[in-house]
């Protein structure tokens, strides 16, 4: 199996403060090992190390209409939740296109997602259909595999996310975990 550390995605909201990105991605890799991921059975890699992620993202962004992006429900909600940041960038708006590239690059036929990610997968399917219509059948149209687990709640009651700064790192002290 493969596990991608999506470090390019972090640039969509942390583009101004990138000094911690390198250490964050290394910490995440160590956390994966500490949580029991066996590197002999699972290949994990950094998204930014595979240049084709960025290349396919660029190609897909050329054929994805802006209204498709602005109608993604998560977009408006995320802007409201992160209103203290300037998210008036293509990087943030185009986050779902980068996600589509992550899926389509590997020609995934099924994708495990939570309910909150269904709109992104629907957009991925639209982008794949448009690409296939323009250039021939290149990408399969991926189907979702819905996870049975509910959203993991962060320290502030919202969905746990590094973007919201509400995570409990695996290497936290017992006092921090208890809080």
Question: Where in the sequence are the language-model features?
Answer:
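N-terminal Rossmann-like or analogous alpha/beta NTP/dinucleotide-binding catalytic cores
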Residues: 1-101
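Active-site cores that bind ATP or allylic diphosphates and position pyrophosphate for catalysis
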Residues: 76-179
């Amino acid at each position: 199996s493969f596990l991608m550390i999506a470090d390019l995605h972090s640039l969509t909201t942390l583009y101004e403060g990138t000094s911690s990105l390198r250490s964050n991605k290394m910490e995440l890799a160590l956390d994966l090992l500490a949580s029991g991921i066996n590197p002999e059975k699972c290949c994990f890699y950094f998204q930014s190390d595979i240049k084709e992620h960025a290349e396919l993202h660029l190609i897909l962004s050329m054929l994805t209409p802006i209204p498709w992006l602005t109608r993604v429900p998560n977009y408006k909600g995320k802007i409201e939740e992160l209103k203290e940041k300037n998210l008036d960038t293509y990087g943030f708006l185009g986050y779902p296109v980068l996600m589509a590239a992550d899926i389509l690059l590997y020609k995934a036929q099924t994708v495990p997602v939570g309910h909150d990610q269904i709109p992104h997968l629907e957009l991925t399917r639209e982008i794949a259909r448009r690409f296939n219509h323009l250039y021939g059948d290149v990408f399969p149209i991926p189907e979702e595999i819905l996870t049975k687990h509910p959203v993991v709640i962060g320290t502030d009651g919202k969905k746990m996310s590094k973007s919201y700064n509400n995570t409990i790192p695996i290497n936290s002290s017992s006092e921090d975990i208890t809080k």
